[in-house]
Amino acid sequence: MLLDAGAQYPAIGVTTFGSSRHHSAGDVTDREVALGINPFADGMGAFKLNPSSHDLASGQTAFTSQAPGYAAAALGHHHHPGHVSSYSSAAFNSTRDFLFRNRGFGEAASAQHSLFASAAGGFPGPHGPHADTTGHLIFPGLHEQAASHASPNVVNGQMRLGFSGDMYGRPDQYGQVTSPRSEHYASSQLHGYGPMNMNMAAHHGAGAFFRYMRQPIKQELICKWIEPEQLANPKKSCNKTFSTMHELVTHVTVEHVGGPEQSNHICVWEECPREGKPFKAKYKLINHIRVHTGEKPFPCPFPGCGKVFARSENLKIHKRTHTGEKPFKCEFEGCDRRFANSSDRKKHMHVHTSDKPYLCKMCDKSYTHPSSLRKHMKVHEASSQGSQPSPAASSGYESSTPPTIVSPSAENQSTSSLSPSSSAVHHTSNHSTLSSNFNEWYV
């Protein structure tokens, strides 16, 4: 596709596609110079962003040729270098800065963050065509960068938007002009083409784009099934490793659990708490094995929930929390309580029958609901902690405090607790001892 951008971007060195323009140095008018039009650009030009003349080395100007025929005939190399430089710098830079600021072009991290190839390619110069062809790559960051380039992320102050397959770069013999300003514009302008920014910085190397893609965590799932013939000491488990849960479950079901010909449904997984107690049906054994493998094949279908379950019955009960369904009504006359599952209704029925099946093992109290028993057990936990030295006193808090810091009133305090003022003093006095004590508490 040919794009005529000359009328729209006259101030950034963009020429019209399709027709060649041949000028001599004498044809350059003051108006063209002030507008930043490059009279020596060929018809197949593209975006050319050059730094100002004061940023370039001697012998270079703010405008260079883009066509092969004028590779050595830039304005700075021949007739009127001083004339062109004096008129071009201020007008070109101010217009370019205003254009890119108002068109919302963002800034990128480096020159490699854009679609445009770096300064390399088959651009013919006075010494013949350049041998390197990495400039023709649409995404050179995904391929190996040429080791012969001294600075592959520098585009020598130029950025060209051409055709796919015709991404030309500047040859190395003209690649000696670099400056912070040229690198800045080469990396930041035209960042608006964000959906195609697939190249990363040159120092990341080839394929660095893929570091932003989360790599799946490789896991090894080990089969700990012990065959009946290997039950003799020392017991030897299967120990086959698998990379996916599906492979492990298929292996256990087919090779260990077996088909309908198996009459004994016994779990012989390593350290299984059932200790060889058989199941009445095969499906119950398969459901039990999920405790060992961690398989949970029943996800909640409601969006945003994300919970998964090992048993379909548990999923069915869980879905009632989303739907609000409570199919189990209290059977006691006059009670209209309803429940999502039968176990909750059974616990509730003890309120009406005055049964207290939940006994405290530390005293003679009993309760109708397990939640009441859990609250009661906290009383025993608090009393047991009160009869013994508290963690703060037994972990060396007072022993780690210098005697000059502790007041006489603080020394007479109970060892079971510390006041906020004294604890604050201890906290500021010895940080290393305090951190070690916390590690001891929560291990």
UniProtKB/Swiss-Prot annotation:
Keyword match Zinc = yes
Cited Pfam families:
zf-C2H2 (PF00096), zf-C2H2_15 (PF23561), zf_ZIC (PF18366)
- Triggers of expression: By chrd/chordin, zic1, zic2, zic3 and zic5. Suppressed by bmp signaling.
Q: Which GO terms describe its biological process?
A: central nervous system development; dorsal/ventral neural tube patterning; neural crest cell differentiation; neural crest cell fate commitment; neural crest formation; neural plate development; neurogenesis; positive regulation of DNA-templated transcription
Report the subcellular localization: Nucleus; Cytoplasm
Instruction: Specify residue ranges for compositional bias: Polar residues.
Output: 397-413
Q: Which UniProt keywords apply?
A: Activator, Cytoplasm, Developmental protein, Differentiation, DNA-binding, Metal-binding, Neurogenesis, Nucleus, Repeat, Transcription, Transcription regulation, Wnt signaling pathway, Zinc, Zinc-finger
List the C2H2-type ZnF regions, as residue ranges: 221-256, 265-292, 298-322, 328-352, 358-380
Ranges for region Disordered: 371-433
UniProt lists compositionally biased (Low complexity) regions at 383-396, 414-433
**Tissue-by-tissue expression:** During early gastrula stages, widely expressed in the dorsal ectoderm. At mid-gastrula, expressed throughout the presumptive neural plate and at late gastrula, expression gradually diminishes in the dorsal midline and increases in the anterior folds. By early neurula stage, expression becomes restricted to the lateral edges of the neural plate, corresponding to the presumptive dorsal neural plate and neural crest, and in flanking ectoderm. In early tailbud stages (stages 22-23), expressed in the dorsal forebrain, midbrain and hindbrain.
Q: Under the cellular component aspect of Gene Ontology, which terms does the record hold?
A: cytoplasm; nucleus
**Where is the region Negatively regulates transcriptional activity?**
408-443
UniProt GO molecular function? DNA-binding transcription factor activity; DNA-binding transcription factor activity, RNA polymerase II-specific; RNA polymerase II cis-regulatory region sequence-specific DNA binding; zinc ion binding
| Stated role | Transcriptional activator that induces expression of multiple genes including pax3, en2, snai2/slug, feb and a subset of wnt genes. Has multiple key roles in the regulation of neural induction and neurogenesis: acts as a neural competence factor, sensitizing the presumptive neuroectoderm to respond to subsequent neuralizing signals. Promotes both preplacodal cell fates and neural crest cell fates, two of the cell populations that arise from the neural plate border. Cooperates with pax3 in concert with wnt signaling to determine neural crest fate.
Task: Report the domain remarks.
Answer: The C2H2-type 3, 4 and 5 zinc finger domains are necessary for transcription activation. Removal of the C-terminal regulatory domain increases activity.
Annotated family: Belongs to the GLI C2H2-type zinc-finger protein family.
Identify this protein by name: Zinc finger protein ZIC 1
Q: What is the lineage of its organism?
A: Eukaryota, Metazoa, Chordata, Craniata, Vertebrata
